[in-house]
């Protein structure tokens, strides 16, 4: 019997976990597969831990790993992928926005021979127009800058064959953007569209700061265009300076005095701001290089509650 691993990162989701686990159990009971439901607790501070332990004691399919600290959604997802042992691995969120009823369709596509089955969100129920527009234009900007095409409306709700999972595990960068990594790997893939539901309960734990950091990771991990933009802006600035110098020289040769204090102040402020912005772009890339060369572990496991887990992995 083939085995399906369902990897679910959670952070302070005590109101959603039990309902989500019941929904998965109902869907998988109708399918001819063994499965594991692997939760990765990303340092939750509510009652998520206790609920996961209770679910694991009552249902052999429910497994859980507890990270030593809040490492972020992408790292928690990576931990789950690293420890999933199924013939296929499905990654999804546990707030019911990724519909469990779509799992049979993903598995069907996998059985047809596709090694990556990527879902694409058509829309999200209850989401503001502003958030829809920012998401839409972010993906357009990302695709314009990046060498890897990221499907607009793409998410981390996907199925991967064991072969693709083993390939993904070889990517160990710290500033992780798994959508980009999966998009760059190749393999035979297909798309399944869906409408994302509203959250079953609670509020999104993805703050504005986390969303901005995630967006920057996506752009900087797969594009050098910001660095090239800095070069082009520098060239234009130099050209502007040469033209301004020629103008002043020409007027001086004509015996005219060029009034320029306000112009000088504006130019200094403008170019000073541009220089700081370009230094910031370079700094972002350098900071990521520093993060990689330290070669620190991506995550630390406080408790591995899977059946037969190697306890020496815990800290």
Each model region followed by its residue ranges:
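Short conserved micro-motifs on helix faces and helix-strand junctions that flank
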Residues: 9, 67-69, 158, 231, ...
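Hydrophobic helical membrane-anchoring modules
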Residues: 1, 177-315
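Structured catalytic core of nucleotide-sugar glycosyltransferases
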Residues: 1-128
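Conserved amphipathic alpha-helical interaction elements at protein-protein interfaces in regulatory
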Residues: 26, 30, 54, 58, ...
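Residues in soluble alpha-helical coiled-coils and helical-bundle/repeat scaffolds
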Residues: 12-15, 97, 101, 169, ...
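Residue-level signature of catalytic and energy-coupling elements of molecular machines
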Residues: 6, 24, 80, 95, ...
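Acceptor/aglycone-binding surface of glycosyltransferases and processive sugar-polymer synthases
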Residues: 63-83, 100-181, 197-216
């Amino acid at each position: 019997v083939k085995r399906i691993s369902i990897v679910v990162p959670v952070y302070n989701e005590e109101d959603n976990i039990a309902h989500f686990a019941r929904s998965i159990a109902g869907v998988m009971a109708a399918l001819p597969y063994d499965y594991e439901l692997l939760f990765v607790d990303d340092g939750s501070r509510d009652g998520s831990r206790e609920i996961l332990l209770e679910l694991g004691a009552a249902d052999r399919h429910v497994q859980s790993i507890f990270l030593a600290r809040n490492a972020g959604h992408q790292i928690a997802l990576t931990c789950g992928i690293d420890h999933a042992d199924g013939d296929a691995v499905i990654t999804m969120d546990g707030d019911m926005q990724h519909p469990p009823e779509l799992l049979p369709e993903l598995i069907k596509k996998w059985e047809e021979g596709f090694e990556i089955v990527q879902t694409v969100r058509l829309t999200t129920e209850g989401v503001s127009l502003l958030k829809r527009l920012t998401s839409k234009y972010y993906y357009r900007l990302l695709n314009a800058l990046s060498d890897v095409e990221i499907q607009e409306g793409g998410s981390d709700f996907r199925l991967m064959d064991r072969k693709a999972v083993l390939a993904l595990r070889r990517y160990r960068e710290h500033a992780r953007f798994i959508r980009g990594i999966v998009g760059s790997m190749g393999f035979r893939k297909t798309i399944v569209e869906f409408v994302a539901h509203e959250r079953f309960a609670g509020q999104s734990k993805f703050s504005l700061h986390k969303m901005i950091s995630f967006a920057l990771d996506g752009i900087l991990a797969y594009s050098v265009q910001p660095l090239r933009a800095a070069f082009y802006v520098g060239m234009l600035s130099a050209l502007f300076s040469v033209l301004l110098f020629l103008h002043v020289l020409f007027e001086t040769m004509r015996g005219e005095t060029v009034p320029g204090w306000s112009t000088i102040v504006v130019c200094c402020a403008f170019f000073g701001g541009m220089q700081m912005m370009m230094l910031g772009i370079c700094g972002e890339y350098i900071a990521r290089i520093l993060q990689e060369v330290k070669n620190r572990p991506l995550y630390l496991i406080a408790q591995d509650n899977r059946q037969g887990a190697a306890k020496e992995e815990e800290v």
